[in-house]
A protein has these predicted regions:
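Membrane-interface "cap" regions at the ends of multi-pass membrane proteins
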Residues: 2-77, 92, 221-225, 235-247, ...
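C-terminal membrane-solvent junction of multi-pass transporters and transport-like membrane proteins
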Residues: 37, 408-494, 505-506
Length: 510
């Protein structure tokens, strides 16, 4: 069992294992080097690194297009931006709360989850999170492939028909571009986390500068910002607005609900709690709102510049840039999109599921193998279908999974901050018979709390599919993230108080 004598407690609160304890747990079936606690000497991410991480992740095409779904639902431009800002400010709270154990103990998300769910039960939240990340990986890979396809079409004569006609609704060269971009992601995964940090550091300012230049060009070309900024909201009453605002806010929270769980995958490399927290607070809500605002302004100007284009095409930067006549402009723009999409895809959608799959089979699956599995599942989830319907993307995909991930976040935050008061036995997180074994490696309290949270958050649409309409449950689905988080947190805390785990005693139970 883990003891205080096997750890080194640093003055800034960070904890690491003594060399002999590290050597001992390295023989455990729950250990591999990708899941190992990071030594304090190797925790070197600064405020800039965390800010750059969020800036590069926020500068992606889905962020650029976020406002489009909200405006098409009836909001005006400032209502859409306030919704985005508020959603990202709210999700910052669970992100910071779950970031703390990463920096304090140097552990990734799947290992952190062992404290609440058990050494084997942690696979439940890890794999739930991984499947969502695989879907996001596929979406970003498809977007990156579209950017490459636009780039190739501009510089290679006859590119669009190079492989013949449409296959499965898309040209053969579209599929080829998708696979090339997919391969670029896998290449960076195999080069490791240090290359990722370098990519994030220079991708963040590069993408922001290029988008600002595109905005300046659009304003100059259109002699202003166009009509979108004077367009009125379609809602006549507060009640009408509220019906759209709540599910929209839930969707905005859901946009980064994945990272609200797995930020320990990054904060484990943090130089201090202050540096990781400041970097995230400064970068996340501001960057998301500013980049979405840029999308609104560029699209508004584009309405004037390209009046022949359909409304949905104007919100797609790939189709918009495809209208340019200058090859060099298209090349620079699409290179920017490729860099931005690579940065966000690997950081947001590969690091966590790769660790999650490694956690399920530590001795069989490495981080690299987990990344490859993520890429394959991302293709199988058919991202081109998820992106085909903008309203479905926001109100089904984002809202839907937010309830499930919030149910996990509620358990993790309650366990770490309320039940354990941030005190974890680091060595036991890697031991099959340590404190977190519970019953056969599963903490049934955490599992029940998660399932109850998911059930209440998802009950409305699930019952509606079989013809049972319960108005209250339909309303609760609009609040899916809040419902999942609140119900799971309350249920878990209640169960831990009424039937507390016996820790060491339960570990040795027969």
């Amino acid at each position: 069992m883990s003891t205080s004598s096997e750890i080194i407690q640093h003055s800034d609160g960070r904890v690491e294992l003594k060399p002999e304890a590290y050597d001992e747990i390295s023989k455990s079936p729950l250990f591999n080097h990708d899941l190992a606690p990071v030594k304090v000497a190797d925790r070197n991410w600064t405020t800039y690194n965390f800010a750059a991480l969020w800036i590069s992740m926020a500068h992606c095409i889905p962020t650029y297009m976020l406002s489009s779904g909200l405006i098409s639902a009836g909001m005006n431009w400032w209502q859409a931006l306030i919704t985005i800002l508020l959603g990202n400010t709210i999700v910052l709270a669970p992100i910071l709360l779950n970031s703390h154990p990463g920096t304090k103990y140097g552990i990734p998300f799947p290992v952190f989850a062992r404290a609440a769910y058990g050494t084997y039960g942690s696979n439940l939240p890890a794999l739930m999170r991984a499947i969502v990340a695989c879907g996001w990986f596929g979406i970003q890979a498809w977007i990156g492939g579209e950017a490459l396809n636009t780039l190739f079409a501009a510089i290679i004569p006859g590119w669009k028909t190079l492989l013949g006609g449409p296959i499965g609704g898309h040209m053969g060269t579209e599929w080829l571009s998708f696979l090339i971009f997919w391969g670029l992601n896998i290449f960076i995964i195999y080069r490791g986390m240090d290359l990722l940090r370098k990519v994030e550091n220079w991708a963040a300012p590069f993408v922001l500068v290029m988008t600002a230049l595109l905005l300046a060009w659009a304003i100059w070309k259109a002699n202003g910002l166009g009509y979108l900024l004077t367009q009125q909201s379609k809602f006549q009453t507060v009640g009408e607005f509220w019906k759209i605002f709540i599910p929209s806010l839930t969707a905005m929270i859901g946009f980064w609900a994945t990272l609200s769980l797995n930020m320990p995958d990054f904060t484990r490399f943090g130089h201090s709690q202050k540096e990781q927290a400041v970097g995230q607070v400064v970068a996340l809500p501001t960057t998301m709102t500013v980049f979405a605002a840029m999308g609104v302004m560029i699209t508004s100007a584009a309405v004037v510049i390209y009046p022949h284009m359909k409304a949905e095409e104007l919100w797609d930067p790939m189709k918009l840039v495809g209208q340019f006549q200058q090859v060099w402009v298209i090349a620079i723009s699409m290179f920017t999109v490729v860099v931005a999409t690579l940065a966000v895809n690997i950081a947001a959608n590969v690091v966590s599921p790769a660790n999650d799959f490694a956690n399920a089979f530590p001795k069989l699956i490495s981080f690299r193998t987990g990344g490859l599995i993520t890429g394959i599942i991302g293709i199988l989830m058919q991202p081109w279908r998820l992106l085909a319907d903008p309203s479905g993307y926001i109100f089904t995909w984002l809202v839907g999974y937010s309830g499930g991930l919030a149910s996990i976040a509620g358990v993790l935050i309650t366990d770490y901050w309320l039940v354990r008061n941030t005190d974890l036995k680091l060595g036991d997180l890697y031991r099959t018979r340590g404190t977190y074994r519970y019953g056969a490696g599963w903490n049934w309290r955490a599992v029940i709390a998660t399932l109850v949270g998911c059930a209440i958050a998802w009950a409305g649409p699930i019952l509606a599919r079989i013809g049972i309409v319960v108005p209250l449950l339909q309303i609760l689905y609009d609040y899916a993230w809040f419902v999942g988080f609140g119900v799971s947190a309350g249920t878990y805390f209640l169960l831990m108080m009424l039937a507390p785990a016996r820790t060491a005693g339960e570990v040795q139970s027969s």
